[in-house]
């Protein structure tokens, strides 16, 4: 008997991941295709949208041809995608240049131009280099011959979905990452675009679970799909990551540690009083929002540590070594500002520090200091959320920080909240699959689909005594930014 499945496609920065999920939430097959990053100048980060499409086609073909899929039929597809990235196409739907990605920081001047008119926040969000509008202004000012040919702008997963369906849409959870969308009334703020002469280049807006068309017949034939595969809009990677982790209810939160780190807290009510570069976005769950803080160099800091000091050790060995050091790393602190910092400082120029180094410190202390420093940076975001009156009943941890029981307990102790680890972690691709399953009508609500698909494996409770000690170290950590801001600025002046 042929069984129905949905595909969840996650367009990340380093790879595209595609999973096939059945009606019980079982992952039948999973494939991943690597992506090339173009960094031609300092601060630049781009990808070729056509390479996303080619990698997706390759991945779907590989998945469909696998033994596990021999008695399965794909009924629906949805997407998760890296947010903020600017894709601009002409009136034939052809990209006019490479996509400028979320981690591209060339547009600081354009951010200041926006701030001069609107202040520090626009449409409930801080004006930062990562957002889409400053990228638009950079192209407009530096590549006017390209900008004058723009017919519509999209975000990364929207372009990929367009390649499959030949229909253009953008959904709310991603649109709110542009600075051109009002999350309160679910509409484009065209007056903002008019201020900067953006033009009428806005795509139609839809909900994350909205049906937007079918895979085109010619592409379906090429990929080995049936002729009636329904496609659903999808969500930004953080919204889909939250759905894929079961984080969909008020006071539930997500801690995701990848290259960057994210703390995401779900809210049923909009909040306008956030400060310190915390974001407020629409969730992919209807009538739900999430506040989000970002640590730019979370897993990146751990990768740097490994490549620089532990080249021959595995990550597991590094974490085991870190666990052998004392809480507080024997008085050694690390700030993970290797690529600047997003929350709470919004500072692209700040750089990392080790504070308190003595001749007694060991490799184990340095490893633990990096792990603790990453976690303190994530704690910055949690502190801001709590100051605004939003408590968390639990945090589900995914990514690199969920692969170690030591790090999970450390998160519980520093954050002072229950930490959950999932039985099976698929991340944003599972969130995309859930949106497709809900869109197809497999479940009456997203909540019932999440309940069926997502299971918790282990729970870590905070140790109050440990938390009190970490609070003392955190109070010192918190002061490092102000003490080193000018010093690192001076160093960059000399270096540059």
Swiss-Prot record:
Sequence positions that bind substrate = 83-84
Key words, A-Z: ATP-binding, Carbohydrate metabolism, Kinase, Nucleotide-binding, Transferase, Xylose metabolism
Q: What Gene3D superfamilies does its record include?
A: 3.30.420.40
Catalytic class of the enzyme:
transferase
CDD domains, per the entry: ASKHA_NBD_FGGY_EcXK-like
Q: Does the keyword Endoplasmic reticulum apply?
A: no
Question: Which Enzyme Commission numbers does its entry carry?
Answer: 2.7.1.17
The record ties this protein, via InterPro entries, to:
ATPase_NBD, Carb_kinase_FGGY, Carb_kinase_FGGY_CS, FGGY_C, FGGY_Carb_Kinase, FGGY_N, Xylulokinase
Question: Which PROSITE patterns does the record match to this protein?
Answer: FGGY_KINASES_1, FGGY_KINASES_2
The active site of this protein is located at 237
Pfam families found in the cross-reference section: FGGY_C (PF02782), FGGY_N (PF00370)
Instruction: Please give one Gene Ontology molecular function term for this protein.
Output: D-xylulokinase activity
Q: Which reaction does it catalyse?
A: D-xylulose + ATP = D-xylulose 5-phosphate + ADP + H(+)
Sequence similarity: Belongs to the FGGY kinase family.
Among HAMAP family, the record links this protein to:
XylB
Q: What is this protein called?
A: Xylulose kinase
Q: Which gene encodes it?
A: xylB
